[in-house]
Design a protein with these regions (language model features):
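Nucleotide 5′-phosphate-binding alpha/beta core
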Residues: 1-116, 120-122
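AMP-binding/adenylate-forming
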Residues: 99-112, 126-180
Length: 180
C-alpha cells in the first residue's frame, strides 16, 4: 500500500521540526483572528509553544466552555475565523455545541485515516453514520471522497434496507455504527 502523502514518511526529527514551525503560527493565528482565543491566549508567548510538552502549558478548552460561549455569542462562541456565512454547514453535537463544516479539501482531515484502512477508488463505502444534525456522516463522507471511493450515504436505521443495499450495489466497506 502506498502512503497517503509524504507527511507519513517523515523522520521523527522532521516531524518535531515541522511541529515546531507550524504550531506557534497556528496558535498565533487563532489568537489574532478569533474573539475567544484572543481572550484565552492573550497572556501567553505563543512563539515559544513549539512542542507537545510546551503545548500542555496552555489552558484546555472544555466542551462546557464552548457551549457557554456559544450561548453568549451564537452560533460559534467566538471560536471561528469569520461568520456562519463562511461555512457550508452548521452542525449541532451533544452539549449542545454548534460546529462549522465544509465539504472540500479533506476539511475534516479523515482522508489519511480512511486511506490507512485500505479504502480507495475501487471501493463503495456504505456510510452508516447519521447525517441528521451531527457532523459524523459528513465527516466520514468527506474522508471517503478524499481517497476517491464512492459513498452510499445510508445513515442509520432500517437494517433490512441497509443489508439489501449493501448487496445490491456491491458495498466493499461499511463505516458507522452497526446497530440499526
Amino acid at each position: 500500500m502506498k502512503f497517503f502523502d509524504d507527511l507519513e514518511i517523515r523522520t521523527k526529527e522532521k516531524r518535531a521540526s515541522d511541529l515546531a514551525a507550524a504550531l506557534p503560527l497556528q496558535l498565533i493565528h487563532a489568537r489574532d483572528h478569533t474573539k475567544t482565543y484572543r481572550e484565552i491566549l492573550s497572556e501567553f508567548d505563543l512563539s515559544k509553544v513549539t512542542s507537545l510538552a510546551s503545548l500542555s502549558s496552555l489552558p484546555i478548552t472544555r466542551k462546557s466552555s464552548i457551549s457557554q460561549a456559544q450561548k453568549s455569542a451564537p452560533p460559534f462562541g467566538g471560536y471561528t475565523v469569520g461568520t456562519s456565512s463562511n461555512f457550508e454547514h452548521i452542525f449541532q453535537s451533544p452539549g449542545p455545541i454548534y460546529e462549522p463544516g465544509q465539504t472540500s479539501n479533506d476539511w475534516w482531515r479523515l482522508g489519511r485515516f480512511i486511506h490507512a484502512l485500505g479504502i480507495g477508488n475501487n471501493d463503495i463505502v456504505q456510510n452508516c453514520f447519521s447525517y441528521h444534525m451531527t457532523p459524523a456522516g459528513m465527516m466520514f463522507e468527506n474522508g471517503v471522497k478524499t481517497v476517491g471511493a464512492t459513498v452510499f450515504p445510508a445513515g442509520i436505521g432500517q437494517s433490512e434496507l441497509q443489508v439489501r443495499a449493501a448487496s445490491d450495489i456491491g458495498v466493499t466497506a461499511i463505516q458507522g455504527h452497526l446497530i440499526f
